[in-house]
């Protein structure tokens, strides 16, 4: 029995039964003691269906007898299925795999170019890498990024078989990335070459030492007064007070009790007189309508003719009624005047009360807000000027040490070369060379202005009594004048007695012609004896210092 229409035979109506998933597509489900079969829970067709509906799958639905089942099972690899808002990146040398190999577990972003291509851009160690994403990978990234941040992160080998997982970059990840960028070392300062120092006076030398080049990077976080929130709070308070003033004025003009008109008063006497006259005229008119109220005249024929004059009693009655009406009108006028004044007083009192309340609440509060806001602005400005931000300075110091040889140029003051030759030791000892150079310099420099203040440099110079060249017969040997006209600097060389522990010789005398004469006489006389560091070479001088260097200590001349 055929298991299904594998060959697309139209004569076979059998459908394809659900097949078990491939082992690589179950994420190790088969190793958990659950048998994979076509009817079990792990053999459900849902394992073959991606969690999301991708565009790549929808285009291939017609290629299968079962709708929704893709043709190539590799389409359902682990990287296709999202789990916990992430998916695996297979080692398939695809764009995401290539980007992961370049930047590792770092953040990358997705951008869309003008031509419609989607690229993923990541950075590591200052090198930016970008790859062009396929439509399927871009769809995967969109499926796990519903908010559209377009920022993702590789979370290392957390997937199956060491695959990296791709998840949406959280705020913590972005903060970590920014911290790492801030912690990257900026450039160091430029160091200058050493050996550029110049000599001082007649002694020119290239100093041996260190040069410090300091590069100072200053970042000052300054903020203007307008960026201070307290200033805007104070200005807002002032604005609120101004608005309160305007609102109070509008309310008082529209909503309060209007200003009452002046009360209309009527003169009671005028009202009484007018009423009395009107009543008299009205009653008189009515009385003339009745002929009985008129007096009658009898003519010659004896006929009664109305005379047009009211009877006296009728006139008296009319006058009485007119006075009564006038009195009543007077009283009514008095009462009306009193009511009008009362109404005016009540309305005026009510308005004043409303004005008092509204002014106290509106103008008072608004004025307080304006005053407080003004004080706040002044205080904020003062504090801003007082509390200026401190500059944050980062100093990078680069030290370059260069050792150079010392070059000494001797220039005697009298332009006269020193008598004799100076024996300097070899170059194997730097300190010895320096001492010899300084001795040579000292031998050619002298100051005639300080002869009287020069201390005796030979007071403690010692010599050995075992030297065969030292005469022992005479303890006091005179220094002969060698034909020089200069005065003798030291008259004698005194040797100590043999029973004393001090075996050194002592020069006696006072300096009178300067150190230069002493050097000249010592040079002419053959110099000092052995163990005293002879200065010049001669037949009677000590052994050359290049062959027999002087001993350190008090036996050194210099």
Curated annotation (Swiss-Prot):
Recorded topology in the membrane: Multi-pass membrane protein
Extracellular side: 252-362
Coiled-coil regions, chain positions: none
Compositional bias annotation for Polar residues: 404-424, 538-548
Highest taxon listed in the record's lineage: Bacteria
Residues in compartment: Cytoplasmic: 1-230, 384-558
Effect of residue 460 to A: Does not affect translocation into the host cell, ability to bind intimin and pedestal formation
Gene Ontology cellular component annotations, sorted alphabetically: extracellular region; host cell plasma membrane; membrane
Motif (Essential for actin pedestal formation) on chain: 456-458
PTM field: Phosphorylated by host kinases.
Biased composition (Low complexity): 213-224, 257-277, 393-403, 436-450
Annotated region described as Disordered, given as residue ranges: 1-44, 182-226, 257-280, 388-451, 533-558
Biased composition (Basic and acidic residues): 182-205
Pfam families (UniProt xref): Tir_receptor_C, Tir_receptor_M, Tir_receptor_N
Main location: secreted
Outcome after substituting residue 455 to A: Does not affect translocation into the host cell, ability to bind intimin and pedestal formation
TM annotation in the entry: 231-251, 363-383
Disruption phenotype: Mutants show reduced bacterial adherence to host cells, and a loss of actin condensation beneath bacteria.
Record comment regarding domains: The intracellular N-terminal region contributes to the initiation of actin assembly and influences pedestal length. The central extracellular region is involved in bacterial intimin binding. The intracellular C-terminal region is required for initiation of actin pedestal formation.
Family recorded in the similarity comment: Belongs to the Tir receptor family.
Function: Multifunctional protein that is required for efficient pedestal formation in host epithelial cells during infection. The extracellular region acts as a receptor for bacterial intimin, allowing the bacterium to attach tightly to the host-cell surface. Simultaneously, the intracellular region initiates a signaling cascade in the host cell, which leads to actin polymerization and formation of actin pedestals at the sites of bacterial adhesion. In strain EDL933, acts via the effector protein EspF(U), in a phosphotyrosine- and NCK-independent manner.
Subunit structure, interactors included: Interacts with intimin. Interacts with host BAIAP2 and BAIAP2L1.
Name of the molecule in the record: Translocated intimin receptor Tir
Organism: Escherichia coli O157:H7
């Amino acid at each position: 029995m055929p298991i299904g229409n594998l060959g697309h035979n139209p004569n076979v109506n059998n459908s394809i039964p659900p097949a078990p998933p491939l082992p690589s597509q179950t994420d190790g489900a088969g190793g958990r003691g659950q048998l994979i079969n076509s009817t079990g829970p792990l053999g459900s067709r849902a394992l073959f269906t991606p969690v999301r509906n991708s565009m790549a799958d929808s285009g291939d639905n017609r290629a299968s007898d079962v709708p929704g089942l893709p043709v190539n099972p590799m389409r359902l690899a682990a990287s296709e299925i999202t789990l916990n808002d992430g998916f695996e990146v297979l080692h398939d040398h695809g764009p995401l795999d290539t980007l992961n190999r370049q930047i590792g577990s770092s953040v990358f972003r997705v951008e869309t170019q003008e031509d419609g291509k989607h690229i993923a851009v990541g950075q590591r160690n200052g090198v930016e890498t970008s790859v062009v994403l396929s439509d399927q990978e871009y769809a995967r990234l969109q499926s796990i990024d519903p908010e559209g941040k377009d920022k993702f992160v590789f979370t290392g080998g957390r997937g199956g078989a060491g695959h990296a997982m791709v998840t949406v970059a959280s705020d913590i990840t972005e903060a970590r990335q920014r911290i790492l960028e801030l912690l990257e070392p900026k450039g160091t300062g430029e160091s200058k070459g050493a050996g550029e120092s110049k000599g001082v006076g007649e002694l020119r030398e290239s100093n041996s030492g260190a040069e410090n080049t300091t590069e100072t990077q200053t970042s000052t976080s300054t903020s203007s007064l307008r960026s201070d929130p307290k200033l805007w709070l104070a200005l807002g308070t002032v604005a609120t007070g101004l608005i309160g003033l305007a609102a109070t004025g509008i309310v008082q003009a529209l909503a309060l009790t209007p200003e009452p008109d002046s009360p209309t008063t009527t003169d009671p006497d005028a009202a009484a007189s007018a009423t009395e006259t009107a009543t008299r005229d009205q009653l008189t008119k009515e009385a003339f309508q009745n002929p009985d109220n008129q007096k009658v005249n009898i003519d010659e024929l004896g006929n009664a003719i109305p005379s047009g004059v009211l009877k006296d009693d009728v006139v008296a009655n009319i006058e009485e009624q007119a006075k009564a009406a006038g009195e009543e009108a007077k009283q009514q006028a008095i009462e009306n005047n009193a009511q009008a004044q009362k109404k005016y007083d009540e309305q005026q009192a009510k308005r004043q009360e409303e004005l008092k309340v509204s002014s106290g609440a509106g103008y008072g509060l608004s004025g307080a807000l304006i005053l407080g806001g003004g004080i706040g602005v002044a205080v904020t400005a003062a504090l801003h000027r007082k509390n200026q931000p401190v500059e944050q300075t980062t100093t990078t110091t680069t030290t370059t040490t260069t050792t150079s040889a010392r070059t000494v140029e001797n220039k005697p003051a009298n332009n006269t070369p020193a008598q004799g030759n100076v024996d300097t030791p070899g170059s194997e000892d730097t300190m010895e060379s320096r001492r010899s150079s300084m001795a040579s310099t000292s031998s050619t420099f002298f100051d005639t202005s300080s002869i009287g203040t020069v201390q005796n440099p030979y007071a403690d110079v010692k010599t050995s009594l075992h030297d065969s060249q030292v005469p022992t017969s005479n303890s006091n040997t005179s220094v002969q004048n060698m034909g020089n006209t200069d005065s003798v600097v030291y008259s004698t060389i005194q040797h100590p007695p043999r029973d004393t522990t001090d075996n050194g010789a002592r020069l006696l005398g006072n300096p009178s012609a300067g150190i230069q004469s002493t050097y000249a006489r010592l040079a002419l006389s053959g110099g000092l004896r052995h163990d005293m560091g002879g200065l010049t070479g001669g037949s009677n001088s000590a052994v050359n210092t290049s062959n027999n260097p002087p001993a350190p200590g008090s036996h050194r001349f210099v």
